[in-house]
Regions:
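Acidic, metal/ion-coordinating pockets
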Residues: 1-116
Length: 116
């Protein structure tokens, strides 16, 4: 199984570069993980961008401290098990979760942990 892990995608230029790469090479991978905490202009991630990532066959979005920069994402974090906050942030005081298990395109379950 081939897994692509992409570090910090920053702003629109980072998203455009990622999408261009995935357009050419995306089918080569069975599972794609992207750090999206700075994908909204270098500060946080929006629900629109998260949905955009998932539409590009990105399986899980990880994050760090900048996940909190856009308050609109808080509800999305609670509802999604594919957008992760850092695991080592206090449970109960921060929305979402820091780990997930998602089935790959090959039918293999993949565990992902987001820690900062």
């Amino acid at each position: 199984m081939k897994i692509l892990v992409v570090g910090d995608v920053v702003g629109n230029p980072g998203r455009k570069t990622l999408y261009a790469y995935l357009e050419k090479m995306g089918d080569k991978y069975d599972f794609i993980i992207v750090n999206g905490e700075n994908s909204a202009g270098g500060f946080g991630i929006t629900t629109k961008i998260a949905d955009e990532f998932f539409s590009k066959k990105i399986d899980v979005i990880t994050s760090g401290n900048h996940i909190w920069d856009k308050k609109e994402i808080y509800t999305y974090l609670e509802a999604s098990d594919r957008l992760l906050r850092p695991l080592n942030y206090p449970k109960g005081t921060t929305p979402g979760k820091g780990y997930t298990v998602v089935e790959s395109r090959k039918g293999v379950k993949v565990g992902v942990i987001s820690a900062q």
